[in-house]
């Protein structure tokens, strides 16, 4: 029942929001048809949160920290593998831990926060876009965001970036609503307070980036526009007080409980992460270009045209230049992370809501015949890709196969990719036909639903790799044969750490000659790790019974030395053994 509760509740909230808003007669949708589409969107959006196993590294990490919070009752000091872990603030940990307490530990409860905050982001795009630019653009922007490949994929993966992007989007849209021409003083004040609160929640989601990004965008906008009167409409006094009230308490509490927190969090996790390669997540200067191009699909053709025209001045002098602000937002965030010493694909997620608005504006400007031509082009591209997968899927799978990713596993992804491309192509065909027969909005929604369905299927395909990316199957295989692991016995993780293992074992493991992100935690509690493999071997040999996980190559090397180990289960990347 718990897996059903979330989409039902989300749909009910969304339904009330839409029924309270205006009808969209001009878009070709009645309220009831719109609600029907919303129901379909909701069901598809939340359909596979439970189905997929948690994947390394982020999904395991950000499920295990909340699990340990619930177990320990300590909601101030985050712990990973029972070691202090200060890399990120706790908002998502709290939300996930709350879901675990109410509904129990499950895949969907681990993923509910990114999925739900992103879902809310789509609904907000509909409501705010309608108020800012008109009903049809509001619907088109929501559809574009809900069917944006990069946004959809990140919304369904348990990382912190989806929640961060959602709060930054609330701040961006709130700012546009607060400063729009015609906003009353009361509206300006209330929406600016929403902006300050959203920035605070972004900070408690992922750190100072939650205020650095919007602050820098505003500074650049002011320097370009020289609209200094805008500063008088930011409500610094009340806004800053609200920001501090939301953002500061946890930082104070965790600092009082842990002397080492402030230096590690603010220096190591912010300045060192941006300026150096200490986190080993470096990439070339062009790292985010293919991610942006792929992530913006299928709306890239519309975005490209609008970006070209987005710098044009609109309205009276002294009024907010919304399109310029959106362009600065997208460009700055993209460039900021491109020059950073730490790069991951999800870092540019906050760019996509702004791009969705650009796509919506351009689609409302284009003639239906032009939209139809573009949709046919997308359908043709999908058809070619589908043909490539059907004809050469096995060869493609061989290209991505290696010893640690065997062909026998990788090939199982191919049917899912084929189904994903087929659904996208079908959506594009329906959109191309609808643009001519039923107008813009019907075609846009068809294209969005096709893209959303394609993204969900692609994620399902990734789950075929779970024997490589997750310890779920290994743990379940062993437990099916011998029952649950005895939690009173030691479990060692030798020169490796699988982020998903503690979550599925429901217990921490003892790290052997492994530090990585646990340096701070092991410095604080060195007795929870073993520094050298040789020391572990002596301890292992003296045991009556215990468990360990090793890489296959490490296992072969140690087993060749005569250390007694019995293989319980293995896959291409992990071997779990017992002492006897």
Predicted regions, residues:
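Cationic, low-complexity basic patches in intrinsically disordered or flexible, solvent-exposed regions
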Residues: 7
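Membrane-integral, polyisoprenol-dependent glycosyltransferases
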Residues: 11-13, 18-372, 502
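Membrane-embedded architecture of ER/inner-membrane glycosylation machinery
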Residues: 20-24, 193-197, 306-580
């Amino acid at each position: 029942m718990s897996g059903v509760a979330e989409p039902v509740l989300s749909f009910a909230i969304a339904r009330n929001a839409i029924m309270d808003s205006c009808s969209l007669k001009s878009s070709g949708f009645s309220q009831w048809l719109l609600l029907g589409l919303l129901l379909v969107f909701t069901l598809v959006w939340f359909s596979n949160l439970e189905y997929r196993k948690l994947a390394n590294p982020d999904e395991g990490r950000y499920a295990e920290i909340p699990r340990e919070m619930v177990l320990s009752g300590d909601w101030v000091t985050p712990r990973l593998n029972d070691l202090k872990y200060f890399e990120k603030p706790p908002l998502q940990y709290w939300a996930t831990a709350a879901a675990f307490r109410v509904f129990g530990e499950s895949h969907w409860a681990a993923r509910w926060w990114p999925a739900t905050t992103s879902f809310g982001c789509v609904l907000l795009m509909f409501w705010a876009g309608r108020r800012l630019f008109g009903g049809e653009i509001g619907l088109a922007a929501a559809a574009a965001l809900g069917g944006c490949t990069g946004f959809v994929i990140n919304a369904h993966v348990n990382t912190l970036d989806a929640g961060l992007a959602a709060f930054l989007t609330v701040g961006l849209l709130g700012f546009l609503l607060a400063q729009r021409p015609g906003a009353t003083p009361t509206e300006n004040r209330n929406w600016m307070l929403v902006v300050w609160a959203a920035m605070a929640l972004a900070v408690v989601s992922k750190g100072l980036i939650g205020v650095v990004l919007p602050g820098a965008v505003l500074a650049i906008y002011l320097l370009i526009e020289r609209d200094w009167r805008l500063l008088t409409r930011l409500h610094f006094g009340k806004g800053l007080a609200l920001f501090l009230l939301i953002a500061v308490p946890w930082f104070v509490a965790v600092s009082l409980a842990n002397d080492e927190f402030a230096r590690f969090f603010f220096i190591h996790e912010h300045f060192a992460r941006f300026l150096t390669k200490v986190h080993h997540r470096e990439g070339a200067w062009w790292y985010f270009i293919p991610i942006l191009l792929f992530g913006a699909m299928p709306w890239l053709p519309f975005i490209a045209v609008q970006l070209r025209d987005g710098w044009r001045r609109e309205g009276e002098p002294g009024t907010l230049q919304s399109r310029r602000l959106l362009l600065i937002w997208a460009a700055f965030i993209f460039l900021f992370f491109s020059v950073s010493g730490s790069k991951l694909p999800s870092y540019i997620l906050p760019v996509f809501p702004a791009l969705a608005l650009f796509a919506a504006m351009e689609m409302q400007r284009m003639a239906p015949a032009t939209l139809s031509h573009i949709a046919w082009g997308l359908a043709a591209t999908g058809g070619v890709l589908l043909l490539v997968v059907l004809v050469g899927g096995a060869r493609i799978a061989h290209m991505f196969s290696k010893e640690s990713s065997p062909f026998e596993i990788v090939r199982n992804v191919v049917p899912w990719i084929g189904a994903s491309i087929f659904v996208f192509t079908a959506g594009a065909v329906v959109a191309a036909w609808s643009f001519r027969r039923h107008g813009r909005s019907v075609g846009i929604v068809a294209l969005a639903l096709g893209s959303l369905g394609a993204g969900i299927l692609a994620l399902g395909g990734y789950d075929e790799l779970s024997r490589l990316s997750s310890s779920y199957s290994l743990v379940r295989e062993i437990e099916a044969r011998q029952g649950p692991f005895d939690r009173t016995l030691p479990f060692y993780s030798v020169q490796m750490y699988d982020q998903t293992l503690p979550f599925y074992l429901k217990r921490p493991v003892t790290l052997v000659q492994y530090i990585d992100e646990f340096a701070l935690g092991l410095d604080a509690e060195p007795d929870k790790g073993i520094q050298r493999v040789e020391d572990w071997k002596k301890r292992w040999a003296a045991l009556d019974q215990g468990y360990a996980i090793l890489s296959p190559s490490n296992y072969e090397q140690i087993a060749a030395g005569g250390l007694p180990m019995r293989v319980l289960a293995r896959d291409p990347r992990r071997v779990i053994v017992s002492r006897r």
